[in-house]
Amino acid sequence: MPTDDDLRAAGKGVQGQLWPATLNAPTGQFPAAKLAPDFFDYVQQTAFGMIWTRPNLATRDRSLITCSMLAALGHHDELRAHLAGALNAGVTREELIEAMMQVAVYAGVPAAVGALRVAADVLGTD
């Protein structure tokens, strides 16, 4: 079984793929992480260290799935970050837009429209 340090390192590796520019950013840049460091350590170990590193789905696929779920749930702040991460993981702009079409069918047009507003900011409209 991996140790906490192993999971942290694996999680940091995934986060580095998704958000390379913020990998070594000071904690103060992220007020929520400064407020609740144990929570973000937990997320790094479990979400990124355990789940994102599992076999059978590539990081790019997990990223596309995550964007779709965040869009469907209306979690726009997290969606904004994960859209940028998806691009870094190799998901194309067109794939992200197509995923929002899928969201519209299964989670409703309002959920997809809200997500597309966020996507327009992240991806641009050109």
Locations of regions flagged by a protein language model:
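Amphipathic alpha-helical interaction elements
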Residues: 53, 70-71, 88, 104, ...
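Mid-chain, well-packed structural core segment of small domains
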Residues: 64-67, 72-97
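Short alpha-helical scaffolding segments that buttress acidic/His motifs in well-ordered protein cores
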Residues: 43-47, 64-69, 99-104, 115
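Substrate/cofactor-recognition hotspot
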Residues: 109-113
